[in-house]
C-alpha cells in the first residue's frame, strides 16, 4: 500500500491512464492537492474524442489493450494516445495504423455519407501523428505508430476506398473543409446523415471520459476483447455500452469492484454515479453469466453508461489461448487493483 496521499493519488492515475509510475508521480506533484487527476475536456475537445472512440469502438483488427490504447495523457484541450503496434494480424495488410486511418481519416461516398472525423487533418513529425479539426479547438496526438506506417496505411486505405467508391476529403482539400464534410461542422437534424453527427454532441462528455480512462478496463481481468456501441436515450443523449471480455484472475467476492470504485472515484473517475449492478459473481466461474454496471451523470448531463463484464474461463477461454505467446502478453496487461482501493465500497445489487 502506498504510504502517502501523493503516492495514493499517483497510484490511481497510473491505473486509470496506463502511464508509468514515474510519469504518474511527476504529474501528481505538479497538481494542486485537491484537484482532479484527469481533467474534463472542453466541449470541442470532447467532441473530437467522441469521434475517436466511435471510430475505434468495434475494432476490425486484433488488439490486446482496450481499443489498442496502451496509455493516455489528457489535458483540457488535448489528448495524447499511445497505441500498441506489435499484435500479429490475421490479414497481412491489416495493422493498427490502418485501423486508425480507417476510423479517423474523413472520407465520403457517392451518397454524401462521411466516415471518420469531419474536418480532421493530419501532420506527422518526430513527436507523433497530430490530428486537428480545421478551425476548431482541440487536438489529438498519436504515439506508438511510426510515421512510415501511417503513410503506408493511407496508401492502402485509399486503394480500398477507390474500390468502394469513396474518397478521402483531404486529398483534394488538404487545408480547408471539403464541401461533403462541411455540413457536419455544425450539424443539424434536417437529414439522416446530419442527425448521425448531431447526436454525438450531447454525450460527448461521456465518450471523452471513457477514452481518457481506456486503460482502466485492464483492472477488471485479462483483456481478451473490448468492444463498444451506443443506443439513444430518452434525454437526447447516447448510452455507451462497453463489453469487456476478460479472464478473471482476482480472488475477490466481487472481482470488478475495484474498477467501479475507480470509475466513480472523485479524484480519478468519471462524473457519474452507479445506478444499478447486476452482479453474478456468486455464480460458478464456468457459468455463462456476466455482470453489468449501470451509471448516469452526477450533473444531469445527457446519456448513460453500461459496462458488461463478460467472463471467460475453462473451455470458454481456450479460444483465446491458441496462441500462447499472445495470451501471455495479455496476462501481463492485467492490472490488479490494490486491496485498499477495492474495499471502500460494497457491490451494488
Where are these regions (language model features)?
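Compositionally biased accessory segments in Actinobacterial proteins
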Residues: 1-12, 16-349
Amino acid at each position: 500500500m502506498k504510504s502517502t496521499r501523493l503516492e495514493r493519488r499517483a497510484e490511481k492515475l497510473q491505473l486509470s491512464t496506463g502511464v508509468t509510475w514515474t510519469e504518474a508521480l511527476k504529474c501528481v506533484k505538479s497538481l494542486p492537492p485537491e484537484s482532479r487527476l484527469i481533467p474534463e475536456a472542453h466541449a470541442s475537445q470532447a467532441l473530437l474524442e467522441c469521434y475517436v472512440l466511435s471510430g475505434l469502438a468495434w475494432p476490425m483488427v486484433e488488439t490486446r489493450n482496450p481499443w489498442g490504447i496502451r496509455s493516455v495523457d489528457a489535458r483540457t484541450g488535448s489528448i495524447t494516445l499511445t497505441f500498441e503496434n506489435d499484435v500479429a494480424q490475421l490479414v497481412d495488410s491489416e495493422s493498427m495504423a490502418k485501423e486508425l486511418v480507417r476510423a479517423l481519416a474523413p472520407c465520403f461516398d457517392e451518397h454524401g455519407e462521411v466516415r471518420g472525423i469531419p474536418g480532421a487533418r493530419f501532420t506527422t513529425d518526430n513527436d507523433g501523428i497530430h490530428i486537428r479539426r480545421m478551425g476548431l479547438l482541440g487536438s489529438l496526438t498519436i504515439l506508438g505508430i511510426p510515421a512510415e506506417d501511417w503513410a503506408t496505411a493511407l496508401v492502402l486505405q485509399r486503394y480500398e476506398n477507390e474500390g468502394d467508391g469513396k474518397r478521402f476529403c483531404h486529398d483534394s482539400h488538404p487545408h480547408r473543409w471539403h464541401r461533403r464534410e462541411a455540413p457536419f461542422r455544425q450539424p443539424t437534424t434536417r437529414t439522416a446523415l446530419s442527425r448521425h453527427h448531431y447526436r454525438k454532441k450531447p454525450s460527448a462528455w461521456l465518450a471523452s471520459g471513457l477514452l481518457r480512462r481506456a486503460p482502466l478496463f485492464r483492472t477488471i481481468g485479462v483483456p481478451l476483447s473490448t468492444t463498444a456501441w451506443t443506443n439513444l436515450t430518452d434525454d437526447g443523449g447516447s448510452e455507451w455500452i462497453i463489453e469487456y471480455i476478460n479472464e478473471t484472475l482476482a480472488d475477490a467476492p466481487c472481482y470488478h469492484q475495484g474498477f467501479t470504485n475507480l470509475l466513480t472515484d472523485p479524484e480519478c473517475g468519471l462524473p457519474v454515479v452507479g445506478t444499478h449492478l447486476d452482479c453474478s459473481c456468486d455464480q460458478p466461474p464456468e457459468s455463462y453469466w456476466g455482470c453489468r454496471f449501470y451509471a448516469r451523470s452526477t450533473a444531469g448531463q445527457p446519456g448513460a453508461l453500461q459496462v458488461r463484464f463478460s467472463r471467460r474461463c475453462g473451455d470458454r477461454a481456450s479460444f483465446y489461448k491458441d496462441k500462447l505467446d499472445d495470451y501471455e502478453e495479455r496476462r501481463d496487461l492485467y492490472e490488479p487493483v490494490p486491496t485498499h482501493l477495492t474495499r471502500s465500497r460494497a457491490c451494488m445489487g
